[in-house]
């Protein structure tokens, strides 16, 4: 028996060995192949010495899964989850267990990527299409997006859309009714300031008194009142005002739709459709508009097209509106959205169906009726005369009521003017109403819930005026009327899941996306009620576990980035960019340099960079790159000097989007600083920095961090994500604040960029666990292994494909770019053909045509083993051999396995397949690996042009189900 010390035996459970794909033998074999003695030797060959850290991170030691779970369990236990009646856009909900287990906790759903490859994403595309159908049915409008980040940012997007499409071109005022949620107004004001819009706040009826391009109303309002806006909206629209409405999704089940009142845009949070509050998120926002505004819609839209066989197929429609194509001219900077949460909400609607939703909404409303009737019977005066779920009260002894509420472990809404609000939800029970009577009235009130209910049944309720009761049918599509049994629902979810390729099947080597392991142990705490069920506006002394977790995570991120402070609020990487640029903007303004509004951006930048700069009110000036893909220093010097007086910042990614560590990065920072600008270092490629270098050490002033890339939050098929920003001390006073929750930061006076003060706090435990489990050495080794895997793949493939960019010592960083343009010229085979052919080999394609058209960018991450890397390499080598057959003329350029990829079961069953110059086996079993573990695309190649020319973004017609 091997003699091992106890210390060595204790290392067996360390998370590090679970997270990193290659074992020690595989690592050594790979090191030998690439020509390095060790990971340290490889690091020295790749990372410029001038920016390498001389000290280790100060995170702590790696630990085992059991130890990590025990620690975070202690944090969770510090949270006191009181019964919440705060409302304000966040409500208790019952997550159906069939959805919790089969979607939220299922890697088949949460590890997929944004469906840029729709042929292997038909399942979640159908689920998202269902979400769009729910959104359109409930709002009464024509076209819905696939989700936005939250209700408040959706409001800001609605304002921007209003300005784009309004015929009142000279108007510069956006009106906001004074009864919207305060966090929504906060985010709208932040965005309006960047655009130079004037925001006027007042009673809804006063909107007609201004020359407006747009207006925003809340339905129902923050106090619970339901208003019929039909006449007001008609008056405003006659004046070319774009009318936008923030709506409660559950109330719309019972209420007249805003679309039928004349609204142009309706948006809101889908949280109460089966998504936990999570101390603020993540939650999907719905966004719906009139068809005439479709080209100005923000975010992703799922549409129906057809595949090569003419069969119905789904895809992301009208992508030319988006940041990755239009850059600074895009409608929005949105990239990551909230697809996983939108899918949960859509499944919630499918599972309950229209009748179930009406029962839930009616029960909520009945409890509100009972509560109101009881209080009014005791002489309590209500602020609102109509309601769906919320009543507001004045004239109470607020201190006494609050004391009784806290003693009963419940939170009410207490406004600064003494108004007390109570919002009921799906989780409300009869006993809760009894307890609320006790809290408001004191003991001995003598009210009986059953008696009050009988009175309401007998006399009727006027809480929803007859004119505002929904008369039209909702969710009549068969999808929402056939899966109400759990057996059927479970099978429907599984049927959709089986159509999608996710990390639980194979590597997803998307460059600049960092599709690493999302370990089960990291995901576990997210479902715990202590984290999942806390309202974001709960008193902070009830959220001590969350507070400590956020403080510890922030401290670790400060250490990892080399910055001085971190702001957790942004809900995505793109929102992080926006928040970071706002901090820069406010910093310049504080120094009397408000005129500094020019943002330098290299040609190779991510599309979100110029889109975010435009969003922050900056002017983009593009700088050139040299033939090696590096920033052209001479061009940068020239342009920095030319715009020096107005230079705000540069946005640069490191390592570069070309996959190399630029030797001149510090000189780039110095050039910008010398001309009075700040350095924004995009954190998209942070997976190649952690433990080896840092943005702060390099010389940057601010960065966002993609927690859904570097720090293990799953991509969810297109969200959630988080984009906290790290800043140097001089920018710390200018990060996002929040109007509702003010934990005493210096930046609290600043506007918000997200609805919740800590963004999507409910998924922060994932990144906390990732860092805690890996520790200082584990984080560093993860980065080094990512470099090893990328260089191994690069060197293997370089024998078959040209590698476009390499850094020092002929190395790449954590990703590499192969150039397909010579092959395309010689054979006619395109990068799209190769991407689709990889589906037949069981792989998602790498990133296509970014940052250079006609290329593939490959990022394997540290979590992939040598076995999986070799399988991918073998597939690419085999595809190269197939291309050679096209080059030689053996296969026609328009009839070969690449041109016809991906192949489906329908292909091999087709009698006409025999006319093809290749066999069925070549088509669907091109490698030995897929013979025993085949992923089958369910549609053939999709016709993108047809889908955009014949736009349809709703569920299939009823005839498809006959």
UniProtKB/Swiss-Prot annotation:
SUPFAM superfamilies: PLP-dependent transferases. It is an enzyme of class 1 (oxidoreductase). Its EC number is 1.4.4.2. Pfam families: GcvP2_C, GDC-P. InterPro entries: GcvP (IPR003437), GDC-P_C (IPR049316), GDC-P_N (IPR049315), GDC_P (IPR020581), PyrdxlP-dep_Trfase (IPR015424), PyrdxlP-dep_Trfase_major (IPR015421), PyrdxlP-dep_Trfase_small (IPR015422). GO terms for molecular function: glycine binding; glycine dehydrogenase (decarboxylating) activity; pyridoxal phosphate binding. One of its GO terms (biological process) is glycine decarboxylation via glycine cleavage system. Keywords: Oxidoreductase, Pyridoxal phosphate. The modification N6-(pyridoxal phosphate)lysine is found at residue 709. It catalyses: N(6)-[(R)-lipoyl]-L-lysyl-[glycine-cleavage complex H protein] + glycine + H(+) = N(6)-[(R)-S(8)-aminomethyldihydrolipoyl]-L-lysyl-[glycine-cleavage complex H protein] + CO2. Its cofactor is pyridoxal 5'-phosphate. Gene3D superfamilies: Aspartate Aminotransferase, domain 1, Type I PLP-dependent aspartate aminotransferase-like (Major domain). The glycine cleavage system is composed of four proteins: P, T, L and H. Belongs to the GcvP family. This is Glycine dehydrogenase (decarboxylating). The gene is gcvP.
